[in-house]
Amino acid sequence: MTSLQERLFAMQDKQYAAFQAKLTPGVPMESFIGIRVPVLRKFAKEFTKEEECEEFLHQLPHQYYDENMLHGLLISEVKDYEECIRLTDSFLPFVDNWAVCDIMSPKVFAKHKEELLAKIKTWSKSSHVYTCRFGIETLMSHYLDKDFKAEYLEIPASVRSEEYYVKMMVAWFFATALAKQWDATIPYIEQNRLAPWTHNKTIQKAIESYRITPEQKEHLRTLKIK
């Protein structure tokens, strides 16, 4: 066991490990140490200041799920954009579950929207489930507000995948887009631009959202594919 692993096990909550394993199918139970996210997040902020951090970021693959979660949190703190992209591209092939994928949210991305868009297009075309999911999620996080352009909706709309965690992310993206950019997004639903399962899941998630008006929800209900 490495010295870092010893420190991680010192934060272990075995009940939480069992809970996390149920939420993350496909990841072996023995991979979970069981560290609560707020605890791991606090540790990550301190660990970034240590010399061992850089070494850890280049030691792939990791043995434990919690090490991958830590890796994602550490990447999110990297301040240099080019280095952050390098580390993200190195790590994504090793991401094997939605939780690790979704915890990655690099702060530096917000300052590099133009360069980031090219990376998003590449990630979204990947055949690797969680690289594709990360690309769509990053688009959703950074380009549905003041940096929005209607043409960006084509990126997730063109994704064709039978992978559950990709389809769910596309649905999540379009439900969020309906809430934030209704006029540009609703034609994608009205014209059946998405695969049937994703189309209906988008409508379901949008109807569940408090950001969608009652009138909009009523219209969406008429667009379900039966």
Name each region found by the language model.
Residues 1-226:
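Alpha-helical scaffold domains
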